[in-house]
């Protein structure tokens, strides 16, 4: 099982395990600020994605947790300051209390910004779901992760992928004994298109609602090994209660 995250080693971003690859594979360039809810989590380098759900809170994956996170909003090219960005430090990161780092069940985290973001056409929140999305629903997945299924190539600009939610039966067949009720698969069983390392924590948006968080998979864009995502619809109550009490 691989999680889509990086380690900084001697100043370089390295994906692990060693046989895995890096970013959105088989996707396309989103276009500057066309995904205004997408954020980059930065600790001196981009290491995960996230989604802005209101002016002061971001949703990401629990496996992206680390101290000293800077949230970067309004980004397109993450290696160039283009003028539309807002860089805001995290004041607290709240990992789901039932997160299991071995199974990646409950792979969700909330990040509170030290100050509220200024919302505009380039920085905007995404709505939480009011119900779960059904199999076959087309979704938009985005991130700055690896774009190769073998080898590594990290993009400067945000990449997008349109992909369908797969049936629970297809998902469980792909990963026997590993899929919980808090996960879903999305993508293409024939391979070639997938999220990858560096995309972790980022959004899966279906019909204008945040339905998924990039969580894990086996390799990237491999045949019969689709991406696995945290099922956000199961956590709306926890998200609202946590925000209200913090």
Curated annotation (Swiss-Prot):
Residues 1-17 form the signal peptide. Residues 24-244 form the Peptidase S1 domain. GO terms for biological process: digestion; proteolysis. It is found in: Secreted, Extracellular space. Its main location: secreted. Disulfide bonds join 30-160, 48-64, 132-233, 139-206, 171-185, 196-220. The active site is at residues 63, 107, 200. InterPro entries: Peptidase_S1_PA (IPR009003), Peptidase_S1_PA_chymotrypsin (IPR043504), Peptidase_S1A (IPR001314), Serine_Proteases_S1 (IPR050127), Trypsin_dom (IPR001254), TRYPSIN_HIS (IPR018114), TRYPSIN_SER (IPR033116). One of its GO terms (cellular component) is extracellular space. Gene3D superfamilies: Trypsin-like serine proteases. It catalyses: Preferential cleavage: Arg-|-Xaa, Lys-|-Xaa. Ca(2+) binds at residues 75, 77, 80, 85. Residues 18-23 form a propeptide. Its EC number is 3.4.21.4. Autocatalytic cleavage after Lys-23 leads to beta-trypsin by releasing a terminal hexapeptide. Subsequent cleavage after Lys-148 leads to alpha-trypsin. Further cleavage after Lys-193 yields pseudotrypsin. A cleavage may also occur after Arg-122. Not sulfated on tyrosine residue(s). Pfam families: Trypsin. Belongs to the peptidase S1 family. This is Serine protease 1. It comes from Bos taurus (Bovine). The gene is PRSS1.
